[in-house]
Design a protein with these regions (language model features):
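Short amphipathic alpha-helices and their capping/turn segments at secondary-structure boundaries
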Residues: 56-57, 90-98, 135-137, 179-181, ...
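Polybasic, low-complexity, intrinsically disordered segments
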Residues: 31-44, 378
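Aromatic-lined substrate-binding rim segments of carbohydrate-active enzymes
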Residues: 85-154, 172, 223, 234-235, ...
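N-terminal carbohydrate-binding accessory modules
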Residues: 39-103, 122, 366-369
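Bacterial N-terminal signal peptides that target proteins for export
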Residues: 4-23
Length: 378
């Protein structure tokens, strides 16, 4: 994920009954047979669901998820000045939908969601969770599916001020159980237990003390949690919908995804890649070699994509290549980012939806071009 700026001083969603006794038990027994039995007993909701390599809607029709990331909820709270960076109103959701978007990736901060490690009371715990739930509801009311993705976390008493290399064993399992309990009755939301791994495929799957990684700024070693545990925890907490599992190398490498796919008794996994210009895998030949085979087995989404990962270009040549390849392979995508930052990552210049740069203008035009014109006389 690109760096973010600092700032100076349709479904019914259940608000979480935080850390019930059963959820605590889920975390403690995440790898046990009890979890597997509980997950197997769950029945998929009649909303977004996976069949083979496709995502289907509640009517059984294939859905290609096309949209944007909405950054802010991962950093504003821990920086101490808000929950969102920009509005979260109904009007702002309507502006997103006006681009013919059907998918928004909403990003989470572990400390803010769990209410730990000294986050300001106004931006943590129940207030933070309810703000996310309310925003997701507004998006749904405008026909937009969502992905709820944990991306900023930290072990122990360290604050989640960045995106480290892997989820932490201290808090992430509790976070996953809480996310699942909150959204288990929302059939139009995908859950994503992690954003951009910086560990190898075995460590991403299994976690553990032998997979310790370092936090980007303070460099402490910490015990990691793996994607198999994430699937176990979410299923045992009652969530039966799709779970998006990233590739390695900042989610840019899917070459080992199928070999290290977590076991899901409900068979509701989505593969997630992040693709930017200047990434190691950012060419059609690389996509054909490493991503197309995955897309033939499970649904694939470019959970983040943009012109360049370092905001060095406001153009559209790379993003055009990425989206055309994705649409030719029934792969979804979410462009980075629906925010008004003063750099080339910003898709918009204001939250009414005015595009910024050639990059934003291209995406708006491209999505509009995918909408079939009405028949004559309609």
């Amino acid at each position: 994920m690109p760096t973010v700026p600092t700032r100076r001083a349709r479904p019914v969603i259940l608000e979480m009954t935080f850390l019930r006794a059963c959820v605590t038990l889920v975390v403690l027994l995440a790898g046990s047979a009890w979890c597997a039995r509980s997950a197997a007993a769950a029945a998929p909701l009649p909303g977004l669901h996976v069949v083979g390599h496709q995502v289907l809607d509640d009517g059984g029709k294939p859905v290609i998820l096309r949209g944007v990331n909405r950054a802010g909820t991962e950093y504003a709270c821990v920086q101490g000045w808000g929950i969102f960076d920009g509005p979260s109103s109904d009007a702002s959701a309507r502006a997103i939908a006006s681009w013919h978007i059907n998918f928004v990736r909403v990003l989470l901060n572990e400390d803010c969601w769990l209410g730990i490690n000294g986050i300001k009371p106004a931006y943590r715990g129940a207030r933070y969770r309810q703000a996310i739930v309310d925003y997701v509801r507004r998006l749904h009311q405008h026909g937009i599916y969502t992905e709820i993705s944990l991306i900023w976390a930290a072990p122990g008493r360290r604050r989640a001020t960045n995106q480290p290399g892997a989820p932490d064993a201290d808090h992430s399992p509790k976070m996953w159980a809480s996310m699942a309990a909150t959204f288990k009755n929302d059939p139009d939301t995908v859950l994503a237990p992690w954003g951009e791994p910086q560990v190898n495929a075995h460590c991403l799957l299994r976690g553990g003390s032998s997979c310790s990684t370092t936090s980007a700024r303070t460099k402490p070693l910490y015990r990691t949690a793996g994607m198999q545990q994430a699937v176990n925890v979410m299923r045992a907490a009652g969530y039966a919908g799709p779970i998006a599992i990233p590739g390695i190398s900042y989610a840019n490498n899917l070459s080992q995804w199928l070999a290290y796919e977590p076991r899901d008794p409900l068979h509701q996994l989505i593969a997630e890649a992040h693709v930017y210009g200047k990434n190691t895998c950012s060419s059609v030949s690389c996509f054909d070699q490493t991503m197309a085979p995955v897309a033939q087995q499970v649904p694939l989404i470019f959970g983040e994509t943009g012109e360049t990962y370092d905001a060095s270009s406001c153009g559209s040549s790379n993003i055009s290549t990425f989206l055309h390849w994705a649409d030719s392979h029934a792969v979804g995508y979410a462009a980075w980012t629906w925010d008004t930052w003063k750099n080339c990552h910003a898709l918009i210049s204001n939250y009414n939806g005015s595009p910024a740069h050639r990059y934003g203008a291209f995406l708006k035009r491209y999505l509009a071009g995918l909408v079939a014109p009405p028949p004559p006389g309609a």
